[in-house]
């Protein structure tokens, strides 16, 4: 690992009352690689993702983006660096349509005075949304129906397409396959590989060890708010990962 | 996900589809239904009193009566689309009117200069209360119901403190003559109604066509999601409550012009009337759905009923009964429609609830 990670965390700590959610956690992801982040419930995965996507203030620790130290003050700040997150609840507005969700917070203004008055170029946004969905092979039947009336798979596709379209550096996917059927899951895993091939660093959080081994290049294990192990996905096994997550391998490790 | 089958069709017809959809968004199902209800009510009264009811003179009267509520309804629609509520509009109207009347009274003359100052003062007072509402709701995280219940009492109480509880009846003649009772030059359309219409059109465009409007819907739809994608939710909420307040200030000066008095005791049910109209017009109290157009229609139903009952000789008190029934019916229809929509979709593209169990095809 001589390359500089696109995103790196060093010694992050964060407490909620008496609970140390992050206790000196390290993490790194390179451009064009899929890193799986695994850990038992309460290991600090979600907290780590929140911290790295600008949703959480830290007690201490360093975050480095492309080698330079940054302080992620807000989700939009993280977004401006090209860090995108697909949240477990997808963070879509159910009453808005797919194109509106795609561009929410980043609308394309109409040119000239109209744009300055707050009018949006809906046509351009629809076209770009359609391109983004097609690129992912996402089944989004209507760009103008409210997202709330769509299936879980379609919502997921929209949320992922949105993140992929904007992610230039890193994309976090928090349990993207948890609520999906077999076909959609395979679609999401394919998407992850495609995004990686574009040179984006992908962080994949999952409880499904077969998926993790299937899609990840490296696996980093969190336990009790700390990274306890990093494995090459090709040279590890479900047993080894579960052992590291639960601490059963502690005695065996040097 | 069977991509190949579906995508080409929707890609090809996307622009044609969206055109009809955006039209549908403007004439959303419920506001359209309620328009039909309004037409039916209108036709019934027209049949019962063909000599009096359907004349321009009478319709003009109804339009004039609705104008002030229309101005309040704009702000209320924005607020309710965010799943908020603003109970303070009536008191805010009174307070703004009282302060404006006081200032104009102290200036002495009754010319346009005084009237202009009065307008500025009234709108500023309304804006001030609105900002207070907005900051307390967005920053202090006090629920809108409580904040605006507090400012409802606060504004009304202060209005009474300022006047000693006695209405001010001195209003510059120019205000009364031109705005209050006057017509748009060359027509028989009340000036006050033209002002309301202009505001309705402007803010209808703002709500349905601009980013400000989109963020309003986004917050009502899912505030947390909006926050996460970078919408400045706090600022947006403050702006919306400030807008509602400023429009209450506008309504305050319009009310002064129309009635020639501060009418301190006359606005105790205004907030509820406006909320009822907004909801009858198809705006969801749960946020994310609503149109200004629907609100306007929703305002006309009580007004037409009131006017019609008087003309056909029914005790006008029945109007309250009828409006109550329409309100409940409107919400009932809306709930059923939404439930049916959810079921209809669940056959093919089910909601998230069913996804876990039986998603095998």
Label the model's feature ranges.
Chain A
Residues 2-254:
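Glycine-rich phosphate-binding loops of nucleotide-dependent enzymes
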């Amino acid at each position: 690992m001589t390359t500089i990670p696109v995103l790196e965390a060093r010694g992050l700590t964060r407490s909620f009352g008496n609970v140390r959610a992050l206790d000196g956690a390290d993490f790194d992801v390179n451009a064009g690689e899929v890193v799986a982040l695994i850990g038992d419930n309460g290991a600090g995965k979600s907290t780590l993702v929140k911290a790295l996507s600008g949703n959480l203030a830290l007690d201490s620790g360093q975050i480095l983006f492309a080698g330079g130290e940054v302080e992620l003050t807000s989700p939009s700040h993280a977004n401006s660096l090209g860090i995108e997150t697909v949240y477990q609840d997808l963070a879509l507005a159910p009453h808005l349509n797919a194109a509106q969700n795609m561009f929410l917070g980043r609308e394309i203004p109409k040119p000239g005075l109209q744009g300055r008055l707050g009018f949006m170029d809906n046509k351009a946004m629809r076209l770009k949304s359609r391109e983004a969905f097609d690129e992912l092979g996402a089944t989004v039947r209507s760009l103008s129906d409210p997202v709330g009336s769509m299936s879980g798979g379609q919502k997921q596709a929209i949320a992922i397409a949105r993140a992929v379209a904007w992610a230039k550096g890193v994309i976090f996917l928090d349990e993207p396959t948890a609520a999906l059927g077999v076909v959609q899951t395979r679609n999401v895993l394919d998407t992850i590989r495609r995004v990686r091939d574009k040179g984006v660093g992908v962080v994949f959080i999952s409880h499904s060890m077969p998926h993790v081994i299937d899609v990840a290049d490296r696996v980093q294990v969190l336990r009790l708010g700390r990274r306890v192990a990093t494995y090459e996905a090709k040279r590890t096994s479900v047993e080894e990962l579960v052992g590291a997550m639960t601490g059963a391998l502690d005695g065996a490790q040097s | 996900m069977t991509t190949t089958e579906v995508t080409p069709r929707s890609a090809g017809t996307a622009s044609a589809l969206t055109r009809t959809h955006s039209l549908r968004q403007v004439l959303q199902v419920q506001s359209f239904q309620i328009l039909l209800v309004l037409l039916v009510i209108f036709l019934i009264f027209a049949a019962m009193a063909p000599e009096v009811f359907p004349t321009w003179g009478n319709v003009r009267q109804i339009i004039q009566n609705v104008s002030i509520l229309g101005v309040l309804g704009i702000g209320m629609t924005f607020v309710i689309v965010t799943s908020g509520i603003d109970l303070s509009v009536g008191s805010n109207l009174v307070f703004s009117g009282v302060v404006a009347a006081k200032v104009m009274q102290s200036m002495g003359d009754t010319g346009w200069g005084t009237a202009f100052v009065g307008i500025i003062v009234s709108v500023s007072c309304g804006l001030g209360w609105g900002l207070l509402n907005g900051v307390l709701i967005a920053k202090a995280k006090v629920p809108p119901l409580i904040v605006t219940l507090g400012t409802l009492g606060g504004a009304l109480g202060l209005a009474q403190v300022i006047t000693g509880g006695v209405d001010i009846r001195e209003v510059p003649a120019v205000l009364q003559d031109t705005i209050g009772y006057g017509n748009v030059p060359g027509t028989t359309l009340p000036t006050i109604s033209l002002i309301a219409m202009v505001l309705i059109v402007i803010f209808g465009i703002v709500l349905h066509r601009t980013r400000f409007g989109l963020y309003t819907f986004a917050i009502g739809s899912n505030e947390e999601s909006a926050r996460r994608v970078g919408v400045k939710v706090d600022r947006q909420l403050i702006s919306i409550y400030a807008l509602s307040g400023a429009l209450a200030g506008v309504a305050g000066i319009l009310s002064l012009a129309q009635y020639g008095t501060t009418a301190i005791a006359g606005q105790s049910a205004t907030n509820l009337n406006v909320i009822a109209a907004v909801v009858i017009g198809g705006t969801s109290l749960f946020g994310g759905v609503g149109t200004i157009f629907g609100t306007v229609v929703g305002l006309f139903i009580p007004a037409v009923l009131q006017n019609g009952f008087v003309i056909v000789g029914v005790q006008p008190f029945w109007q309250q009964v009828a409006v109550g029934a329409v309100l409940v019916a409107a919400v009932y229809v809306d709930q059923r429609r939404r439930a049916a929509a959810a079921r209809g979709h669940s056959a093919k593209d089910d909601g998230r609830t069913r996804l876990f169990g039986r998603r095998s095809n």
